[in-house]
Amino acid sequence: MTIRAGSLDRRTLLRGAIATAAMGSFAVACSSPSSEDKESDSGPKGEKSANNPFGAAANSTVEAAIFDGGYGTDYVDYANQVLGSQVKGLKVQVKPVVDIAPQLQPRFVGGNPPDLIDNSGEDQIGFLGILDQLEELDDLFEASTYEGKKIADIVYPGVKDPGTFKDKFVALNYVMTVYGVWYSKTLFEENGWTPPKTWDEALDLGQEAKKKGKYLFVHGKEAATYYRTLLIDSAIKEGGDEVRLALENLEKGCWSHPAVQGVIKVMETMVKQKMFVPGGSGTQFQKAQAIWSNDQKALLYPSGGWIENEMKKATKADFQMTGIPSMTLTDKPALPYEALRAAAGEPFIVPKQGKNPAGGKEVLRAMLSEKAAANFSKTKLAPTIVKGTVPADGYGSTALVSQTKMLEAAGTNIFNYMFVETYGLNTDQLVPWNSFLAGDLDGKGLTSALQKISDKVREDDSVDKVKVS
């Protein structure tokens, strides 16, 4: 998830598609009356079959505009290694793009967009503005994989959701982002520590850390809201959907829900007992993270699965970075301990007016093959939406192994929320979170500040609201 403006790091490119769409993006200008609902009759066509469900033409080329961010573009090039096994001579020509909207908006207006677009990055095109110009992708999930399995059956639950707008599934989000709490397996084993499953256990661990001259947590000023994510994840597990929906819909008193308050009170206790590395609110976030990953002065750190790649140059040798789900407030939560926040990101779209939309869909089918998905995980150290493509050793990445295990253990108990991104609340929320973690604001003050931020958006009639149910 994106946490700070002006950044093209892994979090930026994984941010949920709905964020840009809901904010009334400038991309509405992409729509034109002449192009709306008009599918291209030109371009190569092939005969539909089990191996060619979309009728992509043999020996044709797919123009793909791919966001050149943290994942690069080579993983889409890799599709060429498998495409030919299904449609003879079909090739994808990848064009790396950083500024998606500025470069591709004119092509939508002109009626000649690329065949496939990775609509990611800081300049992502708003989906609502081009919704009628995009192919729906339900038939992709009904098609078979290159291994002969129905695609809908081999992906994680809920992966359609972030790519569905006004009941139209138009964006395939390819990468799974897993959120959890991270620790050094080596350090824990050396000290006989057990990763906490409840907040009470985390408090006990904090006391053990102090005996060793260490801290439980650390935070950096730009990433103080990672603890907001941890708070919300734990609160949703404790209180269930009513907590998630109240926050998503900016309801009055949403931050005062008992489950939310229960976690805030424990966090407040941890701050008062000096279980956070001091000075975090004045420390650049990667330097703060290095205090955990390299100096090992802190035991735990809440983050998304990007953390290993982000800190690979500042992680102690044999750290064995491992993730666990967020802690539960009690031993009888609404959702089990294994439940976690995970979301599909990196949205791919197929414009109707591309020269080869059938080929664009076929490239996506190729990317969902076991071979292509495994290649992505091996080279990018991140899971795709395709289940079962990461080996037991995680290609040597303990973080990747733990992400896969967490997803498998969660089963259908996977949730997500988007209100922070949808309404651009992170910058405002950073202020009270930094004050709270520094000990300058108590739990009551944090609650009041967060509620005021939600209330301001809810009561602003100029802001389009997204009703979540």
UniProtKB/Swiss-Prot annotation:
Its signal peptide is 1-37
User: PROSITE patterns, from UniProt?
Assistant: TAT
Q: Would you name any one GO CC term?
A: plasma membrane
The UniProt entry, under InterPro entries, shows: Bact_solute-bd_prot1, Chitin_NgcE, SBP, TAT_signal
Q: Looking at the keywords, is Signal present?
A: yes
The compartments listed are:
Cell membrane
Signals that turn on the gene: Constitutively expressed. Slightly induced by GlcNAc, (GlcNAc)2 and chitin. Repressed by DasR.
Pfam family of the protein (one): SBP_bac_1
Q: What is its main location?
A: membrane
Q: Which UniProt keywords apply?
A: Cell membrane, Membrane, Signal, Sugar transport, Transport
Q: What happens when the gene is disrupted?
A: Disruption of the gene delays (GlcNAc)2 consumption, but does not affect GlcNAc consumption ability. Deletion reduces the level of chitinase activity induced in the presence of (GlcNAc)2.
Protein's UniProt keywords contain Protein biosynthesis: no
> Where do Basic and acidic residues bias regions lie?
35-48
Positions of the region Disordered?
Answer: 30-54
Report what the Swiss-Prot or TrEMBL entry states about this protein's PTMs: Predicted to be exported by the Tat system. The position of the signal peptide cleavage has not been experimentally proven.
Family, according to the entry, reads as follows: Belongs to the bacterial solute-binding protein 1 family.
What does this protein do, in the record's words?
Answer: Part of the ABC transporter complex NgcEFG-MsiK involved in N,N'-diacetylchitobiose ((GlcNAc)2) uptake. Binds (GlcNAc)2. Can also bind GlcNAc.
Quaternary form?
Answer: The complex is composed of two ATP-binding proteins (MsiK), two transmembrane proteins (NgcF and NgcG) and a solute-binding protein (NgcE).
Q: Which NCBIfam families match?
A: chitin_NgcE
What is the name listed in the Swiss-Prot or TrEMBL entry for this protein?
A: Diacetylchitobiose binding protein NgcE
Q: Which organism is it from?
A: Streptomyces coelicolor (strain ATCC BAA-471 / A3(2) / M145)
* Gene giving rise to this polypeptide: ngcE
